């Protein structure tokens, strides 16, 4: 009888242990071709239901040696390079990331990243590179949208039209 309760307790606790794993996320968003603007602008509610990346979660990037090689002389322009730690769970919210001066509801670089745990981390990402007019109005957007499976500990390259993204996840 006690073994049955122990087994039930272990089954009940097992998903919770797996559900709150802490990961270090690092990404480099860069341009590798002439901007290819999307037919639609970034939506005003681009970060809907996403949790903003908190300053206290940010970490010093470890892939600076790679970002340093993405130079204009080589045909690249680094747009965003961030590193942070976050818990990853099945029902956790997406993380909203942005960079630059805010213009109404938008930033020059903005996006969301959602991670789901597993041997291969299911990752949904959407990033916009926005261009603004003289009065701060949104004129055009480039968009990178991907759903990929990532292997923790492996640097992954995502190619999309005029933009590219390098992302690495490490379990802490």
Map each language-model feature to its residues.
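N-terminal signal peptide c-region/cleavage motif recognized by signal peptidases
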Residues: 14-16
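Short, surface-exposed beta-edge/turn micro-motifs
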Residues: 24, 163-164
């Amino acid at each position: 009888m006690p073994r049955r309760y122990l087994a039930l307790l272990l089954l009940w606790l097992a998903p919770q242990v797996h559900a709150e794993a802490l990961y270090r996320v690092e990404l480099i968003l860069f341009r590798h071709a002439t901007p290819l603007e999307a037919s639609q602008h970034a939506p005003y509610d681009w970060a809907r239901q996403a949790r903003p990346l908190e300053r206290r979660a940010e970490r010093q990037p470890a892939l600076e040696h790679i970002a340093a090689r993405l130079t204009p002389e080589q045909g690249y322009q680094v747009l965003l390079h961030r590193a942070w730690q976050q818990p990853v769970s099945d029902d956790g919210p997406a993380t909203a990331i942005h960079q630059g001066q805010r213009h109404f509801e938008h930033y020059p670089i903005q996006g969301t990243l959602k991670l789901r745990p597993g041997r291969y981390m299911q990752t949904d990402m959407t990033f916009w590179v926005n261009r603004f007019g003289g009065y701060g109005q949104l004129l055009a957007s480039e968009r990178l949208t991907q759903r990929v499976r990532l292997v923790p500990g492996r640097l992954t390259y995502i190619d999309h039209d005029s933009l590219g993204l390098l992302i690495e996840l490490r379990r802490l």
